[in-house]
């Protein structure tokens, strides 16, 4: 055997896969498939038990449902005296509101405390009559009637309370974009005055896609 044949044989030997590598890869793929199936079943189970508007829960942000997008509204409450209230109706941008028959599936509130936040606030979403002026008296009654669960957000040394989100599922109600003006975000400042530089609320409204939604996040 000349030198060129010897070098070629050496390269061929080096190309041979190590024994057991193929079976190890197959075993890893099989384990991954099993894990994926288990996660899929778990997600389906959790989705089946997703709460309604009367029983919302705290969740992390997630991707929109197929065929849906979301529009975000940012609310910065004004100063709220200790023991007083603030209410703001959900008013979507005109470019979205004009498609008033598009269905809304979920509303999520995210509480974003600013560096000076040191209070305790209660936050909720309520369907309120068009005639309601969202006065302190009216909002107080809504918090007191127990008809809507409340997110209690308190100061946390880490900066953000572990549970800072509240999700409302409107799928069963067949609510649409036009209905959103009937809903309002309500805030109660429990222990002391809430200043204007302490808190921001992000309201994400998940709705069916509309022609302008190509520029909205998905």
Swiss-Prot record:
Composition bias type Basic residues, residue spans: 11-21
Annotated InterPro entries: Cucumovirus_coat (IPR000247), Cucumovirus_coat_Asu_sf (IPR037137)
Function: Capsid protein. Probably binds RNA and plays a role in packaging.
Modified residues (N-acetylmethionine): 1
Transport found in the keyword field: no
Location(s), subcellular: Virion
SUPFAM superfamilies: Positive stranded ssRNA viruses (SSF88633)
GO CC annotations, alphabetized: ribonucleoprotein complex; T=3 icosahedral viral capsid; viral nucleocapsid
Biased composition, class Low complexity, residue ranges: 1-10
Single GO MF descriptor: RNA binding
Identification of the protein by name: Capsid protein
Main location: virion
Family: Belongs to the cucumovirus capsid protein family.
Keyword Mitochondrion: no
Transmembrane segments: none
Short name of any one Pfam family annotated for the protein: Cucumo_coat
Source taxon at top rank: Viruses
Species classification: Viruses, Riboviria, Orthornavirae, Kitrinoviricota, Alsuviricetes
Entry's free-text remark on domains: The N-terminal arginine-rich stretch does not seem to be the major RNA-binding region that allows formation of an infectious ribonucleoprotein complex.
